[in-house]
């Protein structure tokens, strides 16, 4: 299961989605003050999260269901809870990366007016994300343990992301020169 953190990272459409948001929406609207009010920022974040999850969810559903079928076909497991945890943890990984890309976009807004990445902090965060996912491929632990930890982490990350966006994005979500 830890391998799939890297796979879910690799298939996530977060970078393209946030770049499209910037070029088609935020580039023009960030000049207006109403667009930076905390309630508005959080509302837009939730709407956009729903939309990016619609993009990232189908592959996660296929992978999660496919893993369950493969587990069953290969002899299964003694604990039927493993099937549920396997499926839900794949969906949570997809949710995590959707939330992560949007959160980093809102908190660091990495794009310049011409849609080029100008934030060194953004590049650092994305590099750390890559290396953590890569490192997870070396982790060896039972599916149930890793899956439950993954699900709990994803839920906590979502809550923390909403709080951070509400508090900080109105100040950090701006046009770069």
Language model feature labels by segment:
Residues 1-31, 39-177:
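Hydrophobic alpha-helical transmembrane segments of membrane proteins
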Residues 36:
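Glycine-rich nucleotide cofactor-binding loops and adjacent beta-alpha elements
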């Amino acid at each position: 299961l830890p391998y799939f953190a890297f796979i879910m990272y690799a298939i996530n459409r977060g970078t393209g989605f946030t770049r499209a948001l910037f070029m088609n929406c935020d580039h023009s609207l960030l000049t207006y003050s109403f667009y930076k009010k905390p309630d508005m920022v959080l509302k837009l974040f939730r709407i956009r999260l729903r939309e990016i999850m619609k993009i990232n969810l189908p592959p996660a559903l296929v992978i999660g269901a496919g893993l369950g079928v493969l587990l069953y076909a290969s002899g299964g497991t003694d604990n039927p809870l493993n099937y549920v945890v396997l499926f839900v943890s794949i969906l949570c990984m997809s949710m995590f990366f959707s939330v992560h890309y949007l959160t980093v976009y809102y908190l660091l807004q990495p794009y310049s007016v011409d849609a080029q990445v100008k934030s060194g902090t953004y590049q650092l965060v994305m590099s750390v994300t890559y290396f953590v996912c890569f490192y997870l491929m070396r982790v060896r632990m039972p599916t149930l343990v890793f899956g439950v930890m993954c699900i709990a982490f994803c839920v906590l990350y979502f809550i923390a992301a909403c709080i951070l966006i509400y508090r900080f994005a109105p100040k950090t979500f701006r046009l770069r020169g």
